[in-house]
Amino acid sequence: MVKGEKRSEMMLNLFGDNSEEEEIESEHECNRRQPNYASDEAEGGVEPEGEGEAEVEVHGEAEAESDGEQGDVELDPGESEGEREQSSQEADPQEESEARDSDSDNKEEEHGGRVAKKRRQEVVESGSERSGEKHYESEDEEVDQTRSPRSPSEEKEEVQVAQSDVNIRNVFGSSDDEDAEEYVRNDVEQDEHRSPIEDEEGSEKDLRPDDMVLDDIIPEEDPQYESEAEHVEARYRERPVGPPLEVEVPFRPPPGDPVKMNMIKVSNIMGIDPKPFDAKTFVEEDTFMTDEPGAKNRIRLDNNIVRHRFVKSRDGKTYSESNARFVRWSDGSLQLLIGNEVLNITEQDAKEDQNHLFIKHEKGILQSQGRILKKMRFTPSSLTSNSHRLLTAIVESRQKKAFKVKNCVTDIDPEREKEKREKAESQNLKASTKLSQAREKIKRKYPLPVERRQLSTGYLEDALDEDDEDYRSNRGYEEDLEAEAQRERRILNAKKSHKGIPGRSSMTSARPSRRQMEYSESEREESEYETEEEEEEKSPARGRGKDSEDEYEEDAEEDEEERGKSNRYSDEDEEEEEVAGGRAEKDHRGSGRKRKGIESDEEESPPRKAPTHRRKAVIDDSDED
């Protein structure tokens, strides 16, 4: 206490104005940071000349006392710098209170204070020249010794920083002393740029160190290379602290053990109904598959849809009941039974997919139910199952053939081929028309005789008409046939009796040759217009015609011979019979031609001559036939 009173008296004598108190505080801080300077001043320093010697000596004693106090503080070499600063800060508030009480006395000693101020500046300069062994680590430390005056609140902050430095030292050990010193210096620099309002806010923030981030407390290693923007960002970042949020979320327990949860993909062979089953409102679902032509194929999915319903037990508890269940067999295989349908299950590992199950609540809140680690795949159990038949129906509907336009490339021009075919058809048509015209022309020129007529509708109709004739006509025809047969027999008998006559035989042989030549020429003309079939049909008929003509000629010759040998009366009778037979045949032929509407050439034949020319008349008839 004695030392404190002496010190206060000396300060009152030395400092008269309040403005000089700030200089005293800065000087004390310099003395605390540089104790060597104070020891040099205690030894005597430089003695001034002229007036003011007593005042200078008093100042030297005061400095000696302050040095003595500092020497007491420095007796413990193991004490840290933070503790020394703390002790010096505790003495400063007492000095400030005593200085404020003696404001009235300070006015009288203004002149002495000014002289002491000049002396102190000289002492500081001399001390800095003598301290050649100590060097500053950075320019920031030199600036700290000559910083501007500070308010009491700033000094309190320094005390708090020193305390936090001690706490950090106790936590991290003595090896972090350098980092702590840098932290104190950076804190002082930041405080210089802050306003009093920011200082008050900073004091309130210092009371809650738990809200600060550890990365912001520890400064960077090289603060001298920091820019202004980085220096501003180095301020303390606070965690956002506000009123607690109150959200009401219904708690839903997870559906099961996460190890047993699996993810499945619903395919076309099975389905899941998310709505609970109700027999009153249940409606069967029908699925329609549309193929390419647009037809709809109805496919029912009633037997392989998983459904559930809520049932109450006897205790009154509600639980869910499903129509599906899993079955694991002794061999390790797993199957799903949906009613009467059986599906095989294959399991796959899905750890790499990172699948999680969440329940979505209101206001964007998700409740996790667990992680899904496996996948399941369903396949039909057999070829006779309903699911397999469903799959086959879908495949057939998709692969059904549709009518499409097919493109093909050919080397042949279809237009030219069509023209060639049309031309060939037209040529065939022309040839057929020409052939039909030629046949009609031949038929008109050479009509067929009655004997040569073939079976046809007209011929058969004529035969029916002949059946309708009366019995007399048939009887006359039979009589004519009998007469002709008798005539042939007589002719044969006559030939046998007259074989020995040579002249007659030569004449008869010459005449048929002439007739054959005539018929050959006519046949040549007919061959040019008739087909082979007509030639085949006509050739035997001509042969028969020739035979008949030869017979008529022979008959005529034989008749002449017989007339020469027999009586004229008998000959005339025979000739009359022959003429009557020929007339009957001609009448019969004419009647047949009239029924068919064919004009005969015999009607236009010239009139008959006298009986002396009977042979010639017979020959003319054969030629006409």
Swiss-Prot record:
Subcellular location: Nucleus
Gene knockout outcome: Early flowering, defects in floral morphology in whorls 1-3, but fully fertile flowers. Reduced seed dormancy and increased germination rate of freshly harvested seeds.
Taxonomy, superkingdom: Eukaryota
BP terms from Gene Ontology: flower development; negative regulation of flower development; transcription elongation by RNA polymerase II; vernalization response
Pfam families noted in UniProt: Leo1
Assembly with partners or alone: Component of the nuclear PAF1 complex (PAF1C), which consists of VIP2/ELF7/PAF1, VIP3/SKI8/WDR61, VIP4/LEO1, VIP5/RTF1, VIP6/ELF8/CTR9 and CDC73. Interacts with VIP3 and VIP6.
Bias (Acidic residues) ranges: 40-55, 63-80, 523-537, 548-561
Region Disordered: start-end pairs: 1-214, 415-625
Gene that encodes it: VIP4
Sites bearing Phosphoserine, chain numbering: S203, S548, S570, S600, S605, S622
Protein name per UniProt: Protein LEO1 homolog
Gene Ontology, cellular component aspect: Cdc73/Paf1 complex; nucleus
Principal cellular location given in the protein's record: nucleus
Protein keywords: Coiled coil, Flowering, Nucleus, Phosphoprotein, Transcription, Transcription regulation
Residue ranges, compositional bias (Basic and acidic residues): 97-113, 121-137, 182-197, 415-425, 471-491, 538-547
